[in-house]
Amino acid sequence: MASKPSKQVTVEVNNGRSRSRSRPRSQSRGRDKSVKITVNSRNKGRRQNGRNKHQSNQRVRNIVNKQLRKQGVTGPKPAICQRATATLGTVGSNTSGTTEIEACILLNPVLVKDATGSTQFGPVQALGAQYSMWKLKYLNVKLTSMVGSSAVNGTVVRVSLNPTSTPSSTSWSGLGARKHLDVTVGKNAVFKLKPADLGGPRDGWWLTNTNDNASDTLGPSIEIHTLGRTMSSYQNQQFTGGLFLVELASEWCFTGYAANPNLVNLMKSTDKQVNVTFNGSAGEPLVMSVPATSHFVRAVVARSTLPTSLARAGERTTSDTVWQVLNTAVSAAELVTPPPFNWLVKGGWWFVKLIAGRTRNGTRSFYVYPSYQDALSNKPAICTGGLPSGLRAASAVATTLQFTQMNQPSLGHGENTATLGRSIATAGDRLKVILTVGQPVTPNENNKQTWVGKTNTPTEEVVKIGVNTQNYNVMNGFTMISSIDWYDEEMQPLEVPVPMSELLVMKGINKKADVYAAQQYKNSISNNKHQITSVYLVRVKENFQVTNHLSYFFREKVDTTATELMKIRPQTYYTTVNFVQNNWYLLTSTVLHTGSLPSGWVWMNQELMNNENYIVDQGMKHLMTTPPVSSQLYFEMLTSLPQAMAEHFDQGDQAVVAHDSPGQALFSAEETDSDFESTEDETDEVDRFDLHLSSESDDDDVENNRVTLLSTLINQGMSVERATRITSNAFPTRAARLRRSVYNDLLVSGLGPDAAWSHACEQARKVGDNHDLQASGSRGHAE
């Protein structure tokens, strides 16, 4: 019996356009307009079973794909593929009842990061910085519910695909016209996308370098919106927690090796409760203003390079670094924007570039761009009108900004150009600060004096700056600071340093502010009388107010022999002063000490006195006459207290020991809450762990035990400072044990604390040096 004829499969590939009428025939001769591939898909003979049929189909697929690759219609072959699951953050609750954007995820591999403020990277970002092209084989957007299905109600979540990664004015119905998935709160969901949904303009490939054309680099984006106010099912109030955890599970393919290592350092972070305003006039660019002290501005300034050349008349130069800004708060609808770009801000995300120039009124300005391509081309949004007169004086709206660094003008290694960037001040560094003065609090309309604290202040209203509730200075003067420029000793720009862990600002026993820098000036009025002024640069952690008697300095004498002597006005004013959260203040404490001038940092809880003369020293000049608003003050300060001892007496004749006393335990923010858990001593914590150390313990074992205990305490949720103190007490070093022993013996023998501690430290250093020499010698002998 004759077999049936074989089935023929024909694939036609168009790899060129038809010849132009104006082109000579010779130029197009020999070029095929299409390629035909004929494949015999069935073997002759017996009828195929299921297995043979599958093999035949696979054979056809392989042959067709091979021929298509030969013709160059599928783009280059992937050099490497990487499967990864990226955790991008959470979907928040809806607080307005209207459509709110919760996330906008750009799929370029170097931009796929979580909003933690870290520049750390994974395998996808590392490969993106090494190859010039990328594409996606598939993409699954996983939404993992963070609440039960019965815990909240009233909200639906919509995940949609934006194929152009460009902001648009879309309603809930418009989002439904896209490829999308609706998700019910309390249930897990997966939004699946195929290669046909994710293909790029270059035979399915996208470019990796975000400095290139936006339409070739960004790829599609995933947007997540919510509709309907989220309410708690168990309480008659709104639910403000997270609804879903967002993850991307995908396989990225890369080709075309071209290393751009700096692309892995793109930053993504979030700034909560930041004040944002928009302004502009007809024919002028739309400008966004943000406080210079905000985390957003500090991050942008640190990562932006501003040109020093002058722009043309009427223009302002901008940085080359572009930032995507996503407003995830309900206040997006409350932001007042000049026309016609109200839709852009209400849509929830846009692009900005930093404008060159100094800080004005404590804010930095940004040009706003409606698309990434416009930002690269430096074409800002142009307003057709200004704000209505009734809205120009509207106060800034506090909102939440999630910002992403889109590009990096320099793609090489950045370590060799550190002098052009900003370093981070470390503990013990000396730095220089230029403070821009904010609105002063003054006793009269002429602003000729500045408020300072007066004597007889109620105890509960005293503001203390110190290491604890026993060793502190009393705040006398206070000046509001609108912005700060940080520099090192060579006037190179610095990042904002971390707060000084050993210092805190207290009202009563509760911590109210962090101290970032400090300085102390000592001047002799006579051989036996000295004036000590301390200045502290602080940032308020929570709002608080102080109500007490205030006065101000005046010059009692005007003759040439006593022009530096100042006194406090005996008249006082019972006034309330408010200290605002996140604002910067320069706090001043001035004390008079009788006796020999002490060394080290001096702590005296002494207030200003009416009957004493004060000199205008380095830390008090701004308190004598009020500096104008936006004027600048210059100080050289420290980010860590000097490690020295000093002993002196306050006005109550009580001994006060300076910082770094051996028996002095510092307490951190966790121990200064309203509950104040200082009753539990570190020795109690050590006993709770049942740790006993003999003097013959091996140093290596002690070090291992110390590391193990420290890790255990931190993993249990204890603060690093407290865990370190407990670990040091449980497993002290040989030098620490000797220093403690010698110090206690000398105190018992009648030696003073200062001399005893100095002698104990010297003995500990000698033992440490001898131990190092012995260890080195034994290693050399063994070798």
UniProtKB/Swiss-Prot annotation:
Region (Basic): 1-69
Keywords: Capsid protein, Clathrin-mediated endocytosis of virus by host, T=3 icosahedral capsid protein, Viral penetration into host cytoplasm, Virion, Virus endocytosis by host, Virus entry into host cell
Annotated spans, P2 globular domain: 423-645
Signal sequence residues: none
Biological processes, Gene Ontology terms: clathrin-dependent endocytosis of virus by host cell
GO cellular component: host extracellular space; T=3 icosahedral viral capsid
Family: Belongs to the astroviridae capsid polyprotein family.
Organism: Human astrovirus-5
InterPro entries: Astro_capsid_N, Astro_capsid_p, Viral_coat
Pfam families in the record: Astro_capsid_N, Astro_capsid_p
Cleavage (site feature) positions: R312, A313, R392, A393, R422, S423, M645, A646, D653, Q654
Region annotated Inner core, chain positions: 70-262
Domain of life: Viruses
Basic residues composition bias: residue spans: 18-28, 43-56
Core attachment, as annotated region: 393-422
Gene3D superfamilies documented for this protein: 2.60.120.20
Region Disordered, annotated ranges: 1-58
Region of interest (Acidic), ranges: 646-783
Protein name: Capsid polyprotein VP90
Residue ranges with Polar residues bias: 1-16
